[in-house]
């Protein structure tokens, strides 16, 4: 039996109720809704950590963040920790990573200045890539190297690669580029790590594609958001627009897999 290709599509700070398959009334996620209908929809899924770096350390290592010393941001995943990529590599898979990593840099406290182990805006050396060997288009802290319509990641050789167009589209394009160059000799494990719909730290807002605000103004407010507090009225349409962009990009990725004859033997997992 031919071993399947595996793709993990990972979004950042995406609520479960942004998807139609979980009750979102607006047309935010038609592609993901179709995948949920045709495949498996998880009804109970939990993250061990609510913060970027720690949550990623759990997912990559299969261990609690406290076990791998990644209990807060700005703590690098130890190089002796065996990861998903290591296990897939040992099993004869190509390993590929695209997008936000957030597991390479170290500092003594979250508010302290970085020492020489700062890769927030620099290329991540191979030994800090968590075992991803064959294809790499990533930045450690994508918030620090990008905005909605500008930014960059680094390739396998450490060369800076500038975005063209909207950020989520660019990240997805790097994944599609990998699929186009894939030779089929080995099965692949591809991890796509988007930053959307994470807020833009240095701008204090959610940076959606152009036109998203107008498209998603007729939303229903989730019950857990206080009606009389916060700035959700200003930001929620853009937040949904970012989620919709991810859905469109998942659709483009699936179309590429089908065009290349890879879809029937590929498992795609979407989570946040």
Predicted regions and their residues:
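Formylglycine-dependent sulfatase
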Residues: 1-272
